């Protein structure tokens, strides 16, 4: 047993969650197992213990394996900064920023790093479960591919293809994928499974048999929709649980165009007393919101302009006048100040953009990136709690409101607060995962916390996910494919 790979017949078919569930199922069989994704595109990154960064989906998969996340689990991370360009992170460290067209010429040079990371994991674990990206059916991207069949063939890893029946056309998804693949690529596929079924699974029996007959591939089952998916950290901001439709205190988060590292929202959204509202472009900020969160952004100045285009700057000013609370995290913190300057053009064209002016601070973008886990003493609401979090940002922020810090990090003030304490900015991520801090923060908003352990809830959801896979799929057969 060495490795197997999960690929999708399309994007968003549920590969990440399937890999997490298979990792937990394999671990419960007594295997040492590690996740691996050759290439991920996401602005939702996790910081590793050695100061690198990987996709947050791989960090969740590592948790399913009982492991600390390491950079080898996701050697290539692409972090979009615009519609046509992205930052390229290789084995946890920023390599360059490139346009999509230019990345095609860079990809073949990255296969060495991908195989190096994969082989390190393979040498130290019984099983490596690999997740593809997008779909191998995008054959126009096959040249130089390192994410799907290019990797599978280079590493000789068998593939299970996943179709998403929820969006319709699953027969065409899977049979069509075989039809467009190069025969040598198609030979890497050992079987298929159907994901996200709703209703009576037996109603798809004929379709399931038809796929097997048309492709000659073995079927590993049809998986119903996992009802506890909302209890796992969201990979996409659109997947964040919105809480009950009625009841609960509203916390609103602005869905920025380059939203990044929004894992801070999951523990808040899981609180029964909170109704998390993701404010979409074109929508006003709910007047009943007790707290408005400005999340992280991969393009602070760009998202400041985007925010103003939605009229959210006007809504925020009105929210503050009504006595509402505002929390800016990372890029959101930078937006709250008087200005954001990027003299070297690190995130885009050089220049300075006026901020929202809700905090008396100013930010200057610098080339150095702070990427570290930290242990802090939270000063907000006088909690004085010791909490673990992480920082992942460029830029330095200074100003008078930093005299009222959100926390103390390594003996230094971190973050800033307005004189009335209602507007807060901080570079710290991950604090809301700490139950005591989350309770203290919510108490300051007049919200009673549930007292539930967020970490225990995620662990329970991973166990339930593994149980769900064991019930409906031939997990033993899937794991037996590994070679």
From Swiss-Prot:
The active site is at residues 330, 429. Disulfide bonds: none annotated. Residues 248-437 form the GATase cobBQ-type domain. InterPro entries: Class_I_gatase-like (IPR029062), CobQ/CobB/MinD/ParA_Nub-bd_dom (IPR002586), CobQ_GATase1 (IPR033949), CobQ_N (IPR047045), CobQ_synth (IPR004459), GATase_3 (IPR011698), P-loop_NTPase (IPR027417). GO terms for molecular function: ABC-type vitamin B12 transporter activity; catalytic activity. Keywords: Cobalamin biosynthesis, Glutamine amidotransferase. GO terms for biological process: cobalamin biosynthetic process. Pathway: Cofactor biosynthesis; adenosylcobalamin biosynthesis. Belongs to the CobB/CobQ family. CobQ subfamily. Catalyzes amidations at positions B, D, E, and G on adenosylcobyrinic A,C-diamide. NH(2) groups are provided by glutamine, and one molecule of ATP is hydrogenolyzed for each amidation. This is Cobyric acid synthase. It comes from Rhodobacter capsulatus (Rhodopseudomonas capsulata). The lineage of its organism: Bacteria, Pseudomonadati, Pseudomonadota, Alphaproteobacteria, Rhodobacterales. The gene is cobQ.
């Amino acid at each position: 047993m060495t490795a197997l790979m999960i690929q999708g017949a399309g994007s968003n078919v549920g590969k990440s969650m399937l890999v997490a569930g298979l990792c937990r199922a394999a671990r419960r069989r007594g295997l040492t197992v590690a996740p691996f994704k050759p290439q991920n595109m996401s602005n939702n990154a996790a910081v590793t213990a050695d100061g690198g960064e990987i996709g947050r989906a791989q960090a969740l998969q590592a948790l399913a394996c009982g492991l600390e996340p390491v950079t080898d689990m996701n050697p290539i991370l692409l972090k979009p900064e615009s519609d046509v360009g992205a930052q390229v992170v290789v084995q946890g460290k920023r390599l360059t920023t490139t346009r999509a067209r230019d990345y095609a010429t860079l990809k073949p040079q990255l296969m060495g790093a991908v195989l190096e990371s994969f082989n390190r994991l393979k040498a130290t674990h019984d099983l490596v479960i690999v997740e593809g990206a997008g779909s191998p059916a995008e054959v126009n991207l096959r040249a130089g591919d390192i994410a799907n069949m290019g990797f599978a063939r280079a590493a000789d890893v068998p593939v299970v293809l996943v179709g998403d029946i929820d969006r319709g056309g699953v027969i065409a998804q899977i049979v069509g994928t075989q039809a467009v693949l190069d025969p040598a690529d198609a030979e890497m596929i050992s079987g298929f499974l159907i994901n996200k079924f709703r209703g009576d699974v037996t109603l798809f029996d004929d379709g399931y048999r038809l796929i097997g007959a048309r492709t000659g591939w073995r079927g590993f089952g049809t998986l119903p929709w996992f009802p506890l998916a909302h209890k796992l950290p969201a990979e996409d901001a659109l997947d964040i649980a919105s809480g009950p439709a009625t009841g609960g205190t509203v916390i609103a988060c602005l869905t920025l165009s380059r939203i990044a590292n929004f894992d801070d929202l999951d523990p808040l959204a899981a609180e029964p007393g909170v109704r998390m509202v993701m404010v979409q472009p074109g929508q006003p900020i709910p007047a009943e919101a007790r707290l408005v969160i400005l999340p992280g952004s991969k393009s602070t100045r760009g998202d400041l302009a985007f925010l103003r285009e939605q009229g959210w700057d006007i809504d925020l000013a009105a929210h503050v006048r009504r006595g509402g609370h505002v929390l800016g995290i990372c890029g959101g913190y930078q937006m709250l100040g008087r200005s954001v300057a990027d003299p070297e053009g690190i995130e885009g064209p050089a220049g300075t953009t006026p901020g929202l002016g809700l905090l008396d601070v100013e930010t200057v973008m610098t080339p150095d990136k702070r990427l570290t886990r930290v242990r802090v003493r939270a000063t907000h609401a006088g909690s004085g709690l010791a909490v673990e979090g992480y920082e992942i940002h460029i830029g330095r922020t200074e100003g008078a409101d930093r005299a009222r810090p959100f926390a103390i990090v390594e003996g230094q003030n971190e973050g800033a607060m307005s004189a009335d304490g209602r507007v807060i900015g901080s570079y710290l991520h991950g604090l809301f995962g700490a139950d005591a801090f989350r309770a203290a923060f919510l108490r300051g908003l007049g919200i009673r916390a549930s007292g539930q352990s967020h970490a225990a809830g995620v662990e329970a959801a991973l166990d339930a996910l593994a149980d769900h896979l064991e019930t409906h799929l031939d997990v033993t057969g899937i794991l037996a494919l590994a070679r």
